[in-house]
Amino acid sequence: MAASFLPSILVPLVGLVFPAIAIASLFIYIEQDEII
């Protein structure tokens, strides 16, 4: 039963968390590049 509703949670989680991590890491890279 857990496997039936797992994709409905996992897909939005990956769709929101992965871009957030990518944007945050890019922002940190740009900030460090400006400081140096």
From Swiss-Prot:
GO terms for biological process: photosynthesis. Coiled coil: none annotated. It is a single-pass membrane protein. InterPro entries: PSI_PsaI, PSI_PsaI_sf. The chain crosses the membrane at residues 5-27. Belongs to the PsaI family. This is Photosystem I reaction center subunit VIII. It comes from Chaetosphaeridium globosum (Charophycean green alga).
